[in-house]
Amino acid sequence: MQTTIRGELVEPYAEALLSLAQSHNLADQFQQDSGLILDLLAASAELQEFLANPLINPDAKKNVLRQLTVDKVHGYFLNFLMLLVDRRRINLLAAICQQYRALLRKLRNIVLAEVISAVELTEQQRHAVVEKVKTMTGAADVELAIAIDPELLGGVVIKVGSQIFDASLRGQLRRLSVSLAQPV
């Protein structure tokens, strides 16, 4: 229930941000701006707690946001952040930014592929993953979100939406173990 209510609050703000971006030809700029915000929030649990705390004065939140984003985000995007503070929705900032990016990808026929690898991928490997995902999905382009997990031992796991393609050594060993455990 909580997730549904949260989603119902996030979607209209993300759509409004996308509409603003499109009307002023700022979709790419807002994508960068939302990425910056997501990076700031991911790097600081204190910032997340500060913004989410309803007891903190809204003006203090605005000042912190201005200081963190001065000359880094477009003025319209900063105004949007101030609006979220005024409407007491700043606690939804990360979700709104993520949803904005998802809406923009959908609009541009770009899919997000979450790639987990045992080691850092080379440029050639990244290109191969992008081409494989394009073939699988029919998307115009692919955005990669890469994470490193040494426990995979080797290979990659690619997640696109609800589809998972497990080409990891750990996955192969698990499948082999399951097949060997079955009676003949």
Curated annotation (Swiss-Prot):
Provenance organism: Synechococcus sp. (strain PCC 6716)
Topological category with respect to the lipid bilayer: Peripheral membrane protein
Subcellular location: Cellular thylakoid membrane
GO molecular function: proton-transporting ATP synthase activity, rotational mechanism
Name the UniProt record assigns to this protein: ATP synthase subunit delta
Main location: membrane
Family of this protein: Belongs to the ATPase delta chain family.
Gene Ontology cellular component terms for the protein in this record: plasma membrane-derived thylakoid membrane; proton-transporting ATP synthase complex
Keywords: ATP synthesis, CF(1), Hydrogen ion transport, Ion transport, Membrane, Thylakoid, Transport
Assembly with partners or alone: F-type ATPases have 2 components, F(1) - the catalytic core - and F(0) - the membrane proton channel. F(1) has five subunits: alpha(3), beta(3), gamma(1), delta(1), epsilon(1). CF(0) has four main subunits: a(1), b(1), b'(1) and c(10-14). The alpha and beta chains form an alternating ring which encloses part of the gamma chain. F(1) is attached to F(0) by a central stalk formed by the gamma and epsilon chains, while a peripheral stalk is formed by the delta, b and b' chains.
Keyword Metal-binding: no
Keyword Transport: yes
